[in-house]
Amino acid sequence: MFSVFGLSIPISATELLLASATFCLVFWVVRAWQPRVPKGLKSPPGPWSWPLIGHVLTLGKSPHLALSRLSQRYGDVLQIRIGCTPVLVLSGLDTIRQALVRQGDDFKGRPDLYSFTLVADGQSMTFNPDSGPVWAARRRLAQNALKSFSIASDPASSSSCYLEEHVSKESEYLIGKFQELMAGSGRFDPYRYVVVSVANVICAMCFGRRYDHESQVLLSVVGLSNEFGAVAASGNPADFIPILRYLPNTALDDFKDLNRRFYIFMQKMLKEHYKTFEKGRIRDITDSLIEHCQGKRLDENANIQLSDEKIVNVVMDLFGAGFDTVTTAISWSLMYLVTSPSVQKKIQEELDTVIGSARQPRLSDRPRLPYLEAFILETFRHSSFLPFTIPHSTTRDTSLNGFYIPKGRCVFVNQWQINHDQKLWDDPSAFWPERFLTADGTINKALSEKVILFGLGKRKCIGETIARWEVFLFLAILLQQVEFRVTPGVKVDMTPVYGLTMKHAHCEHFQAHMRS
């Protein structure tokens, strides 16, 4: 028995020695597990965490808000744990630009998360951990294919490019559909129709054809995308707590099945293209990729080929880049229009002055419609419906703001925090498109570049430019002809629901009135 501070403790010398040895072993393991920090650098700060689960409870149902609050206490570079996995969290515009742009090679990796291996058979450019020359070459090819079939023009069309042609047709369909619904029930939920039209645009770009809106092919694509968003929104704890992969997990099983079905669908579309492919007559993005596969190198300085089985993965990435983001952006835009009728009126006055009613808006009108552009920027900023980028990881040992970051560290980039940072924005909680306009009514370019929604640097969304064009065209054409309202007395719920893309509650009380 030992006496400590006058208290008798019933413990033998052997037990005390064993307890001391256990403590020393645990202490040594913990110290060995932590990376050695080079002299002159520090480890990122962060809050105390629970054993095994880490900061899961701290993150709660709104991780973007929880991590924004933590950044106010610990700074722009902080570290948390999800399960037993350390995660670096970046906030602040300057810090994120430093990491993703100036030190882009250090932060261009993707973490080797289990859920990422389930997307596109583990070969997705977007989710794959590979960041070497093969990945870079495929990314360039995908960007070029997407761009060429967006800005290229159809000789038989009066539109300036394929994207303009497809969006114009879908916008006209939506206007007609909204009037049909108004003649019936007098109200509707625009999301269910917008999502199908946006899917039809990307189908036309990727597969060379638009579908009837009741087509089972088109509706199955929409259904798969909606399922992906719903399942991804719940997150995959198995990414950070590996033992969960081997326990009953309905959400994970659903995610596996969803990706399998989407992969099978894309393979079917690719097989149909191979049957009808004619060299020299390129109809769409898939044909363009097949042509490269059959004889062109992706990189003239390296022997890098695009195999047949990889084409389906590239098409899946492009489809994802051009679908959910655009749908969500338009959906949020419509919500802001009905909750800010004075803003909608200003946009329509600008359209009337610049374009009139004799013709449809075109992409070339974009520089002459600054208020509409300011509205889109404010929608992106205020909603921040992509609160985080897809997680990054470090490709080598590096440092940031004086903190040591080891190779392979998972990195969360908090875009929501930037878009609501009081250091950057006056009254960030207010929806105010005018903040982006200069005294002479033009777009404040420096301020517009502070809105971060599509990521930055080498992993920036490949569909960003096309997404911005598409959102602009849909809104310009719709607002030229239609005034949106909600049923009198109905309060619109703008509360965002956290997910891969944050959605608002569906509103079934929209009304669309034709403008005179």
Curated annotation (Swiss-Prot):
Q: Where does substrate bind?
A: F228
* GO cellular component annotations of the record: endoplasmic reticulum membrane; mitochondrial inner membrane
What are its cofactors?
Answer: heme
Which InterPro entries does this one have? Answer: Cyt_P450, Cyt_P450_CS, Cyt_P450_E_grp-I, Cyt_P450_E_grp-I_CYP1, Cyt_P450_sf
Q: Report the principal subcellular site.
A: endoplasmic reticulum
Show the catalytic activity: an organic molecule + reduced [NADPH--hemoprotein reductase] + O2 = an alcohol + oxidized [NADPH--hemoprotein reductase] + H2O + H(+); estrone + reduced [NADPH--hemoprotein reductase] + O2 = 2-hydroxyestrone + oxidized [NADPH--hemoprotein reductase] + H2O + H(+); estrone + reduced [NADPH--hemoprotein reductase] + O2 = 4-hydroxyestrone + oxidized [NADPH--hemoprotein reductase] + H2O + H(+); estrone + reduced [NADPH--hemoprotein reductase] + O2 = 6alpha-hydroxyestrone + oxidized [NADPH--hemoprotein reductase] + H2O + H(+)
EC number, UniProt record: 1.14.14.1, 4.2.1.152
Q: Provide the glycosylation site positions.
A: S71
Q: What protein name applies here?
A: Cytochrome P450 1A1
Supply the source organism for this entry: Balaenoptera acutorostrata
Give the gene name. Answer: CYP1A1
